[in-house]
Amino acid sequence: NSIIQQNFDGYEIILIDDGSRDNSNNICKQYAATYPHIIFIEKENEGVAITRNKALNIAHGEYIFFIDSDDIVYPESFGKVVSILTNTQPDFLRYDFNTIDIHDANLYPNHLRKKRKKYHCMVLNAADFMQKVIKNEYYLCMHVFRRDIIDKNNIRFLDGCTYNEDTLFIIQYLQHCSKCIYADILFYGYRKCDEAVTAHFTEKHYNDVKRVYRALSKLATDNNKIQMGKNIQRVAGELALHLHKHVSAKQHIDKEYQDIENDCKQKALSIEWNFKRWLPENLCNIAWELINLIKKIANRL
């Protein structure tokens, strides 16, 4: 409803039922029967990557937005974003969001938004955009993509991956961008719920992050732009930190993770991995906790 009620109508909506077990199928059919610009596809459950790839294969629009089914688009925001797209013709655009509950109420402030404001409608290259605007927020639904760049470079989601697959997709895409723009527009309401696929870190998620780490490391090695390669390595290092937080609960640390940890320490991908390289384990853990606290405080300043 939040999309249909926008003050803009030059778009298509692709709804895909990935084997839902509730009444979603009937609701989607009703929407498709009522609105000619809605395309509805029903299929067996194959996971988020294959589902999104199917949508990309049939999309017709010049620009691609990804909207999760339980989230919302704020009133009149669609037209504002499209106006910027039309006037600036960027390769990549980022808008902003609030994290909301089931009643659409804000859960907590978006502290990084005020840091991004100074880049509103400023043209940046991909490497600068990663550092100054995205930071560590590689959220698929907060960005707009050009379909021709996606198709020309055959960019697709990693099959079977359900955790950090958006990070990999965005970085693959950014390698082909020269004109990135941030729009200081509150466009998206991201609904935080306990039932979400990413709400609890599972063994499947653990293995997915390792897959994404390997893919990012290869992208960084293959990239011939020095700063872009460093940025990609930094993101890979952040993913490895996420792995490390959960690996202590495992009874057996697998060789693949150990190889990732050694890679991060050898490349000194962040200050945390530098500490891990030189400090004893107990001092390293204290240092990591202090760094994490400092980062949280810095984000709120």
Residue ranges of each PLM-predicted region?
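Short, acidic, metal-binding catalytic loop of nucleotide-sugar glycosyltransferases
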Residues: 1-10
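Membrane-interface aromatic/basic loop that binds lipid-linked glycans or pyrophosphate carriers
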Residues: 218, 247-301
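Short aromatic/hydrophobic "clamp" motif used to bind/position activated sugar donors
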Residues: 64
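Donor-binding/catalytic cores of nucleotide-activated saccharide
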Residues: 48, 69-180, 188-204
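A conserved acidic beta->alpha catalytic loop
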Residues: 17-26, 44
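Acidic helix N-cap motif at the loop->helix transition within catalytic regions
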Residues: 22-30, 72, 76
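Catalytic core of nucleotide-sugar-dependent glycosyltransferases
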Residues: 185-194, 199-227, 238, 242-268
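Glycine-rich, basic loop-to-helix element that forms the pyrophosphate-binding segment
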Residues: 43-59, 80
